[in-house]
Swiss-Prot record:
This is Purine permease. The gene is uapC. Able to transport with low efficiency all natural purines as well as purine analogs. One of its GO terms (molecular function) is purine nucleobase transmembrane transporter activity. The lineage of its organism: Eukaryota, Fungi, Dikarya, Ascomycota, Pezizomycotina. The chain crosses the membrane at residues 68-88, 107-127, 136-156, 184-204, 211-231, 263-283, 294-314, 385-405, 426-446, 447-467, 481-501, 522-542. It is a multi-pass membrane protein.
Length: 580
């Protein structure tokens, strides 16, 4: 084994500086090093209707195979575009009206920083550092890209609602929310504290982690994260998730009265813009080339933006006022620990860890690497530890928790390239996109209806990921019972998030108790946290040998029915007749 496949110390002779210089020179000065003999037309050939096309398979590039420089850059850009929508969506939502209610400057900064941090911390996962004199690693050594986690959005929006209602965040005389940098700083600091949980769990055996968090626990949890986010996305699709959506039909205009083209919430124009994005994504999947399929979400967003700009929905003032370049810590936020947020964020980190294990397993599979054994367990350990550290570093870099992205596994499978050089090129493009602040300003200026058409599809893919995880569950009576019980309360909390808001009536001056009650209330308002806790508890206490149903499947039911009809029509007679 070589490189990241090796578990023990690397005993191979190290390359000298001269070797590295000669290798780099060959990459830039020879045809094989620059473009090779790869069929680049494969990436750009669309699937035209009514045209019979010759199917051809591209060569597979393994983890450490030699790959032409141009191809590495091209596939790296494809990876960056595939994850772009997922990276920019959380900061846009958390900086918007459902989050900290920031202005354009802070929103642009968070989008830029999210891209930069994603690029830098993805490189940490790919590089895979060995912890000195231990058997532990930091990182997977695979094309494991990280981005801002969707699991944080639901908890963060609920927390900001609580902060504004309790006076932690300011409101004006009319009750309208004002920017709350203090609340965002509390989210960052509490996230850094809670990231220690994932770092600690990374030193446990991967087999023990899988036993504690099997698919029957992780599947419904991930599904409800996506389901809860789809509601906010649909509000944006119809015009915006701010105050104009809280009481539609009263004359309020979205996104605001001074917008370039304000309309009432739910107007046909808004619905049409979002549908254009949605339809473009479907067309790219049906007729697009391989590179278009992996970037279908971004292509749909681009088409929607072009039409919205032509129809006068874009506000260019933020783009014109934005600086040319940006970087981490251009803006900072006061760091404080918000006690009620600790319990919900601990649940978020459990979900992030479970997602990471599943995504790393999928990456090993599509990269044609072993998915069991010591090497695989080492990758899981390094990936979980790396993810915990990246979450800690992300918080210190003013960004919410990160998680391993699954959509890039589709890029690997589609392009048949699992090479880390393409992954490093992806990191390079993400950092470059983040540094150019005008690019982030253009993303922040995207109309809500266009963004909603994209995020509805994106969040639905999160929910479907949960369904895919649940498909690996054996549908025994025990597992059906666990899923039913955990879904019952979790789905109810997702549909009615304020169901537990009036349970506690304490109004004393014990701030510690008040913070604990607010934390419990915040957990109970997040359906995925309730489902995850119930699923984990029931999976531990219910015995594995629970009595099965007499009829276990549709085939058994049909067979029993046929036998009963042949044996006799009277109840209870079929069994005796068959025996006879």
């Amino acid at each position: 084994m070589d490189g990241p496949d090796q578990i023990g110390p690397d005993v191979r002779p190290r390359r000298t500086f001269g070797d590295r210089v000669r290798r780099a020179a060959r990459a830039f000065t020879t045809r094989d090093g620059l473009i090779g003999d790869y069929d680049y037309g494969f990436l750009f050939t669309p699937r035209l209707p009514f045209v019979k096309q010759k199917r051809r398979a591209a060569p597979f590039f393994g983890l450490e195979d030699k790959i032409p420089l141009v191809l590495a850059l091209l596939l790296g850009l494809q990876h960056a575009l595939a994850m772009l929508a997922g990276v920019i969506t959380p900061p846009i939502l958390l900086a918007g009206s459902s989050g900290a209610n920031f202005g354009a400057d802070e929103s642009q900064y968070l989008v830029s920083t999210s891209l930069i941090v994603s690029g830098l911390l993805s490189a940490v996962q790919m590089f895979r550092l060995h912890v000195y004199k231990t058997r532990y690693y930091v990182g997977t050594g695979l094309v494991s890209v990280v981005g801002t986690s969707f699991a944080t959005i639901t908890v963060a929006t609920g927390t900001f609602n609580q902060m504004y209602s309790t006076g932690y965040c300011p409101v004006d005389g009319s009750g309208n929310r004002l920017p709350c940098p203090k609340g965002y700083g509390a989210l960052l600091a509490t996230s850094c504290l809670c990231s220690l949980l994932e770092i600690g769990l990374s030193f446990m055996s991967s087999r023990l982690l899988k036993a504690l968090f099997p698919p029957i626990v992780t599947g419904p949890t991930v599904f409800l994260i996506g389901a809860s986010l789809i509601g906010n996305a649909m509000k944006d699709w119809a015009g915006g998730s701010g105050t104009c959506s809280s009481n539609p039909g009263n004359g309020a205009l979205c996104p605001s009265a001074d917008a370039p083209h304000p309309l009432p919430w739910g107007s046909a124009e808004f619905i049409g813009l979002g549908f254009l994005v949605f339809a473009t994504i479907i067309l790219c999947e049906r007729f697009g080339s391989p590179i278009m399929k992996s970037c279908a979400v971004i292509v749909g967003l681009l088409v929607g933006c072009i039409v919205a700009a032509a129809c006068g929905y874009f506000d260019r003032s933020g783009i014109d006022a934005a600086p040319v370049a940006s970087f981490i810590w251009v803006k900072t936020f006061p760091l404080t620990i918000y006690a009620p947020l600790i319990l919900p964020l601990l649940a978020v980190y459990m979900v992030i860890m479970m997602e990471s294990i599943g995504d790393i397993t999928a990456t090993c599979d599509v990269s044609r690497l072993q998915v069991e054994g010591a090497t695989f367990d080492s990758r899981i350990q390094g990936g979980v530890l790396g993810n915990g550290i990246t979450c800690l570093l992300a918080g210190l870099c003013t960004i919410t928790p990160m998680s391993v992205f699954a959509q890039n596994n589709g890029v690997i499978a589609l392009t048949r390239c699992a090479n880390r050089k393409a992954g490093y090129c992806c990191c390079f493009f993400l950092v470059v996109m983040g540094i150019f602040a005008k690019f982030a300003a253009a993303l922040v200026a995207i109309p809500s209806s266009v963004l909603g058409g994209m995020t509805t599809f994106l969040f639905s893919s999160v929910a479907i990921s949960g369904v895919r995880i649940m498909c690996s569950v054996d549908w025994t009576r025990r597992n059906r019972f666990i899923l039913t019980a955990s879904f019952a309360v979790g789905m109810a909390a997702t549909l009615v998030p304020d169901w537990f808001s009036y349970f506690f009536t304490y109004s004393g001056d014990n701030h510690a108790l008040e913070g604990l009650l607010q934390a419990v209330e915040l957990v109970m308002a997040n359906g995925f946290a309730v489902t995850g806790f119930l699923g984990l508890l029931l999976n531990l206490i219910l015995p594995e040998d629970m009595e099965e149903d007499v009829v276990e499947s549709e085939e058994d039911y049909e067979a029993t029915t046929v036998v009963g009809m042949q044996g006799g029509s009277e109840p209870g007679s079929s069994g005796q007749n068959v025996k006879a």
